[in-house]
């Protein structure tokens, strides 16, 4: 008998002459007389065989166990169009599936069994692969992770131990230098005190003797003592006035340590809750600069913008700008993205910085009111009050960080990515300070 009743597997349709006549399906086999066998169990168990999904025994005939609810005949065919089992009448001429693609239910079930077998084999292979991965790869990874973790712990302990020893040694050295400087200043002060105490006694003696001459000698005696009076006056004039000397002051440079500064800056940057939210004051932006809407980016424009230069806060010539943030006490940090610019200045300035004119008094770093780190092409320097200190950098920083400690009087420029200190300026800043910026090439922006 052909496998398709109405059309081939590829979906071609056939005419009414190819529709099979319904044939009686074999009914269920008569029950056999019970014979001797094992005692009945608690319930029906699965028949012995290869197991679920592994096919049937060779020669085992497919027997439909359900009847068509419409015709009462066995569901021995499968409609591929409606994806459901049907009887021969449904599949035959005039049936609801007459024009559909159909095949024997037995063949379709066998195909499904084969697919299940394939899936089971794939699942078995997948399970074997996962089992091997868990047993071999993960176990090896776990052992390697433990070894690496132990080695990393050892490295951390060794490095921190070395840092700790170095810090203790540096602490001892600096404390000894501070103590020595204190002793030196103290001895200088004691020496000066003894010197001036002696001079005071001598001056008192001269004054007392001259007062005694004035009160006890007559005119003739005074004339006779004229030479002695002149000598005593000359001796008094030889005692000079006290002069200010740095030797009498404690030299703070004795405590300057690149190592301590580096560690301190790194520690401070790591402990700060966050950078200052610095915003640029739009009233101060020079005519060659464009300010972004978020007030954090300055773009150089060789064409002067049509801005009102009458504002007393605005720079009317140089491409400068001040921030709205004012710092007078405490510790402050912020960073600027400078990777796109080859000509910029970043630093701090006081409110006394002149704004009008093209003179040097308005240029950042050329007056007493601004302290800036500047770059021009491949040259870097720190500038203040017309003094320009060249800085030798190994590479051009993409970001420039600033750390301002007003209590200690320190302005530190550093590279945020590595924490490398680029320059330190120490000074007792007299006024409120504002972050200040200048750009003459492309763009710089404050890091949020």
Swiss-Prot record:
Cellular compartment(s): Cytoplasm; Membrane
Q: Where is the composition biased (Low complexity)?
A: 1-18
Recall the GO molecular function terms of this protein's record: ubiquitin protein ligase activity; zinc ion binding
UniProt entry keywords in alphabetical sequence: Calcium, Calcium transport, Cytoplasm, Ion transport, Membrane, Metal-binding, Transport, Zinc, Zinc-finger
From the UniProt entry, list the residue stretches annotated as the region Disordered: 1-58
Compositional bias of kind Pro residues: 19-51
- What Gene3D superfamilies has UniProt attached to this entry? 2.60.120.920, Classic Zinc Finger (3.30.160.60)
Question: Which segments does the record annotate as B box-type zinc fingers?
Answer: 63-111
Among SUPFAM superfamilies, the record links this protein to: B-box zinc-binding domain, Concanavalin A-like lectins/glucanases
- Write down the superkingdom of origin: Eukaryota
Q: Which InterPro entries does the record cross-reference, listed alphabetically?
A: B30.2/SPRY, B30.2/SPRY_sf, Butyrophylin_SPRY, ConA-like_dom_sf, PRY, SPRY_dom, TRIM/RBCC
Which Gene Ontology terms of cellular component type are present?
A: cell leading edge; cytoplasm; membrane; perinuclear region of cytoplasm
Known tissue expression: Predominantly expressed in testis. Expressed in brain at low levels.
UniProt keyword annotation of Membrane present: yes
Give the record's membrane topology: Peripheral membrane protein
Pfam families associated with the record:
PRY, SPRY
Summary of subunit composition and partner proteins: Interacts with TRPV5 and TRPV6. Interacts with YWHAZ/14-3-3 protein zeta.
**What does the UniProt function comment say about this protein?**
May regulate epithelial calcium transport by inhibiting TRPV5 activity.
In its UniProt entry, what is this protein called?
Answer: B box and SPRY domain-containing protein
Q: Which organism is it from?
A: Rattus norvegicus (Rat)
Instruction: Report which gene this protein is encoded by.
Output: Bspry
């Amino acid at each position: 008998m052909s496998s398709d009743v109405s059309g081939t597997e590829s979906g071609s349709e056939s005419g009414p002459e190819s529709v099979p006549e319904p044939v009686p399906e074999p009914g269920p086999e008569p029950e056999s007389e019970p014979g001797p066998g094992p005692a009945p169990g608690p319930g029906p168990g699965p028949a012995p065989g290869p197991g679920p999904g592994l096919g049937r025994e060779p020669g085992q005939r497919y027997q439909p166990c359900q009847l068509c609810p419409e015709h009462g005949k066995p569901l021995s065919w499968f409609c591929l169009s409606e994806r459901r089992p049907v009887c021969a009448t449904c599949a035959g001429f005039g049936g609801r599936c007459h024009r559909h693609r159909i095949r024997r239910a037995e063949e379709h079930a066998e195909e499904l069994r084969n697919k299940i077998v394939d899936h089971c084999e794939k699942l078995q292979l997948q399970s074997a692969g996962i089992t091997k991965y868990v047993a071999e790869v993960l176990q090896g990874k776990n052992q390697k992770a433990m070894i690496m973790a132990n080695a990393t712990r050892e490295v951390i302990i060794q490095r921190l131990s070395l840092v700790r020893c170095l810090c203790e040694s540096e602490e001892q050295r600096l404390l000894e230098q501070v103590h020595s400087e204190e002793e030196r200043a103290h001895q200088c002060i004691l020496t000066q005190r003894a010197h001036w105490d002696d001079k005071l006694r001598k001056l008192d003696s001269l004054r007392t003797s001259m007062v005694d001459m004035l009160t006890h000698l007559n005119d003739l005696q005074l004339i006779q003592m004229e030479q002695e009076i002149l000598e005593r006056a000359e001796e008094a004039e030889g005692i000079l006035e006290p002069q200010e000397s740095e030797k009498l002051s404690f030299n703070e440079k004795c405590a300057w340590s690149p190592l301590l500064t580096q560690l301190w800056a790194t520690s401070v940057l790591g402990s700060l809750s966050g950078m200052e939210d610095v915003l640029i004051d739009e009233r101060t932006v020079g005519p060659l600069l464009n300010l972004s809407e978020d007030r954090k980016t300055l773009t150089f424009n060789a064409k002067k913008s049509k801005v009102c230069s009458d504002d007393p806060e605005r720079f009317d010539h140089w491409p400068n700008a001040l921030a709205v943030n004012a710092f007078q006490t405490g510790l402050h940090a912020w960073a600027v993205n400078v990777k796109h610019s080859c000509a910029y200045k970043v630093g701090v300035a006081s409110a006394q910085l002149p704004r009008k004119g093209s003179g040097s008094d308005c240029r950042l770093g050329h007056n007493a009111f601004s302290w800036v780190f500047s770059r021009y092409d491949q040259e870097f320097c720190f500038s203040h009050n017309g003094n320009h200190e060249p800085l030798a950098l190994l590479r051009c920083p993409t970001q420039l960080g600033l750390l301002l400690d007003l209590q200690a009087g320190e302005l530190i420029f550093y590279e945020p990515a590595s924490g490398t200190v680029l320059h330190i300026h120490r000074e007792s800043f007299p006024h409120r300070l504002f972050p200040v910026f200048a750009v003459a090439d492309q763009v710089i922006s404050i890091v949020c």
